[in-house]
Amino acid sequence: MNHSDALYKRIYQKLLTEIEEGMYKDGQRLPTEKELSQKYYVSRITAQKAMRALADEGKIVRVIGKGSYIAD
């Protein structure tokens, strides 16, 4: 596992925990990839990988040009 893989997994786990603890409500918009990259001091690609993993699991819905939202 390289450094960027570890970083994306850390962001993924942090967001997953926040989702499961109810920090975000169903349908609520999540921070953008740019906002996440600035918050966690990572590249936008790393933030994108974390968001893609959440989408692949059905935790969030990504809408091109609109953002990412908590799945209902």
Please provide the spans of the model-predicted regions.
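Extreme N-terminal segment that seeds HTH/winged-HTH DNA-binding domains in transcriptional regulators
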Residues: 1-44, 52-61, 66
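Basic, amphipathic "hinge/linker" alpha-helix immediately C-terminal to the N-terminal HTH DNA-binding motif
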Residues: 66-72
